[in-house]
Amino acid sequence: MTLQIIAGKAGTGKTTHLMDEVGEKIKKTSKTYIFIVPDQMTFQMETSFLNKQNLAGMLGTQIFSFSRLAWKILQETGGLSKTFLSQTGIEMVIRKAALDQKDKLKIFSRATSKKGFYSELAKLFKEMKQEEISVDELEKSAANLSTSVSSKVHDISLIYQKYEELLAGKFLENEDYLRLLADKIIESDYLNQTEIIIDGFTSFSKQELTVIEKLMQKCDKVTVSLTLNVPEIHKGLEDFSMFKASTEAYFALLEMAKLNKIQVEPEKILLENKRANSDSLAFLANAWGDNKYSSYEGGANDLTIHQANNRRAEMEGVAREIRQLALNGYRYRDIAILTRNIGDYDILCETVMESFDIPIFIDKKRAMAKHPFIEFIRSSIDAILFNWKYEPIFQAVKTEFFFDVAENATIMRRKADILENYVLENGIQNKWKWEKEGDWIYRKIRGLSTNVLPQTDEELATQSVINEMRNLIVEPLSTLENNITKAKTGIEFAMALYHYLEQVKAVEHLESWRQVAEENGYLELAREHEQAWSSISELLDEFVEVLGEEELDVNSFSEIITTGLDALEFSLLPPSLDQVVLADMENAKLLNMKVIFAIGMNDGVMPLRQKDKGILSDQDRDSLRVENSNLKPSAKNNIGEEDLLAYKIMSLPSDKLFLSYPAADEEGKVLSESNYLRKIKGQFKNLNESVYLTDPSLLNDKEQSSYIRSKQATLGLLTSQLQMYKRGYPLSNVWWDAYNSYFEDSKESEAAKQVLSSLYYENKTKPLQETTAKNLFGENIHASVSRMEKFFSCEFQHFAQYGLKLEERAHYKLQAVDMGEIFHGAMEWISAELKRTNRDWGNLTEEECRQMAKLAMTFLAPKIQHEILLSSKRMEYIQYKLLQIITRATTVLNEQAKSSAFRPIGLEVDFGLKGDIPPLKIPLQSDSELLLQGRIDRIDAAEQDDRTFLRIIDYKSSSHDLALTEVYYGLALQMLTYLDIVVTNAQKMIGKTAEPAGVLYFHMHNQYVQAEKELSDEAIARELQKSSKMKGLILSDPVAVSLMDTNLEKGKSSNIIPAEIKQNGELSARSRTATKAEFDKMRRFVRQKYQEAGNKILDGAVSINPYKLKEKTPCQFCGFRSFCGFDPSLASNQYRHLTNEKTETILTKMDIEGGTQ
């Protein structure tokens, strides 16, 4: 029994030497030669053996990792009777242990609910087993340390002991196999007459060293290769040496041999770099291996450093280099891309390499958490825990496992959308509402539902869909909840979940998806669907094995299962024979690589700016290591490991090394280059440095040609180059050749035309054809005033809402429009009640005003937005605040009525074909008509001296005034339209003609009075009355004004209307008035605006043409903005800038444009 150490720096041929030596020995002896390599290296080592002529097909060689050797020996000697626990199972058991000990924990009681806590604990427990650290040793190390450290160790010990208790006698984890292997090696016949060759390790855990010690005692010979700087062996250990770990291993092996009286053969030291095929790469590897600063004066064509604008530009630059290497004869399998942060590059790399038609293998396991099946299970459990709230329910619905497998998925998705809309609109947020007996009733009601009509056929059809989908969810989810609620033990919980998955036919869903993916050539996706079910089956099996007899509650079950789900990962297929590999620098074990791309070489990444993370902080570790040196050192002591990682990269390729870094991240944050790159630049005087450009136009023709990739991917870049050409920049012939190539192939030309058409893209709409317009809007247009205002705001907004009939999704929340409905409804109810009891607004007492307001709110509250005002304490408070506003408004109207001769003659008066007043008919082109319909809040009338006056009052929940500029541009037509309608129909309404008295806005709000000194009650009342003054436009007639405010005195301003009387009895300039002639001009003009709008609608006007008046624009609150794509930065998208003009100018324009009709 002997030990031999093969030592040398990276690239000196240690692995090749060992393989050649075994190749020679195997010809002369019947011994078995076993190679032990790291897990990540086994596949490549097997491939190397197959490709090695003197070893190919040799039966006397075997390749194992430590864990695979353990399986082999334990199969032979016994020891596999216990159940193996996966990483998922380990984390579930740790969570169970932590939950059991939660009340005893001093530090980690809150952390038990945090995601990631259990994976960190699993890492620590793994370290303790690998380094053979017992709980007693850890507690002893912490005995004299600070309270925070000793409390952490106390918690770790409690959880670890419970964890071991749960595993005891029944289960094994990976680290337990090495312990069993060490015990069973002596009994193995398989290891008789064998030589062990250990290669590819930079260090060994204490557990691995124990296994090696047992192998030394059993096997004929143990050979270990170590990457060392040989002079350091004899100088002794340096704290920050990159070879510290391997030097420690070297001395540990010699010490073990000495203790076990194992003969040590002379060590073989390899000094010559046999890997690097160029002087520059050989110099780089040697310089870094010696850790000495020296400079290289020669050419360095095989070593380059590249900067890129961002990670995408970097990845595309790498892809272009790989394409060129392939053209020069390199195989893809000769090339590897290494990165420190594979999570920053994996998806990007896959996308970019696909666009360049480069086969890529990404050496990273992907979490299973986002797979629909995993999400379905998690969301279903959350739905039960959180009383069937909307979010988890519909997260589960959208995975499609509730759907009938036999139904068309597209139809089922549409039905699910209908259900979701209903749930959101009706505020269905708990189990009681979901399981309530009877069908859900669907009515398309907006605002107040004071007059509910019978359901239409369309509503009944929608209701049927809603209840169909509701039942698909409620039945299985209720069964799951009932079973989980009854469950007491782990096995009962697992059975409840398994039966639920059976009930929704999860296997059939996954199998159906797998078949579809396979038929469409998505083989990896097909494998994922297959793995998802097998992983869940294994997870439940492990759960039952470990916790089947344990008593649990619903919360504990949820937490443990969620931990298991979080730990699930998709397994990796080994790479094909010819693929580029993307791998993580730290874990990659690569052999025979000719070209290496080291990407993301930024400061803080290489070397890594260590963060204090994990269960034990750096300070904790430093303190504990004083007593227990087996514990891994703190991150701040890992400088040597960072240098070793960089050295591994520098010495890995035989032919070429490309180093690159992005200058900014995705958000534009500046990133600087690694210090390692600065060091290399200082060493190499003739180093090739360049930039991976996003825009190739600055390069020569040959360099630009490297940007040409697959036809599909090149289209985007070609488009951007042609865009630059359009702006006057020169265009290389490379791009004209690419352009022509698309139109030589009829299959490609259509796609090319579609993409290249973006060069001439303008975000403009074309007018609808006449027949289309009439199909959408009708021969005669039935419209409201607000609709016409919307048309003048933006034609496309009108088209989207009234032509395409698009609607924003309704949510169960009280919005401004709902409050407006309540205010209108309250005023209507109070007025109707006064009329019914033959009372007048001006005769009410203050107490009667309060009572009226309260009764109105009591009547209206259940009738707004599916009883939203009755749904919660918060809504109860909002109802109280709304009542205050209604009460205040009632009081103000009462006060105003006492000082006014005007009285309401109509409230919520409908005009239209079925209204109290006929529609306003506007003649349009081609014998069509525009029929205006709507509802007028309030019509007031007053009489004096055989003159009758009519005015319009509109209740508003926010402050409004009549701006003639907005009237002129068609943005505020409502009030003057209503006035026109009532004056025109006065004979029908009141049996006589009438004059327009004005239009006024009544602001419904709860006013506050601000004063610098204390005010009397009378003064406060006066101030409140002033703040309630109505805004708008009134007739400049002393009679009309005096009827509106009977208390208005000379030299005073009205507290009711926008009028002020001068001392001479005339209206002041501060009054908002218009003459009857001016009102008539405005009425004619408004009709003309409707005619203009109606004709344009019939002409198919759908332009994206929002206005801008000062800072006001319809886009601010438009729900269709993402749909129309309006972008003011485009020349084709500009606002219609409207200007404010003087009243006289506006009236003159109205007179000219309004005609004489």
UniProtKB/Swiss-Prot annotation:
Coiled coil: none annotated. Binds 1 [4Fe-4S] cluster. The keyword Protein biosynthesis does not apply. ATP binds at G8, K9, A10, G11, T12, G13, K14, T15. Its EC number is 3.1.-.-. It comes from the Bacteria. Keywords: 4Fe-4S, ATP-binding, DNA damage, DNA repair, DNA-binding, Exonuclease, Helicase, Hydrolase, Iron, Iron-sulfur, Metal-binding, Nuclease, Nucleotide-binding. Residues 271-590 form the UvrD-like helicase C-terminal domain. [4Fe-4S] cluster binds at C794, C1115, C1118, C1124. Its cofactor is Mg(2+); [4Fe-4S] cluster. InterPro entries: ADDB_N (IPR049035), DNA_helicase_suAddB (IPR014140), DNA_helicase_UvrD-like_C (IPR014017), P-loop_NTPase (IPR027417), PDDEXK_AddAB-type (IPR038726). GO terms for biological process: double-strand break repair via homologous recombination. GO terms for molecular function: 4 iron, 4 sulfur cluster binding; 5'-3' exonuclease activity; ATP binding; double-stranded DNA binding; helicase activity; metal ion binding. HAMAP family: AddB_type1. NCBIfam families: addB_Gpos. The heterodimer acts as both an ATP-dependent DNA helicase and an ATP-dependent, dual-direction single-stranded exonuclease. Recognizes the chi site generating a DNA molecule suitable for the initiation of homologous recombination. The AddB subunit has 5' -> 3' nuclease activity but not helicase activity. Heterodimer of AddA and AddB. Belongs to the helicase family. AddB/RexB type 1 subfamily. This is ATP-dependent helicase/deoxyribonuclease subunit B. The gene is addB.
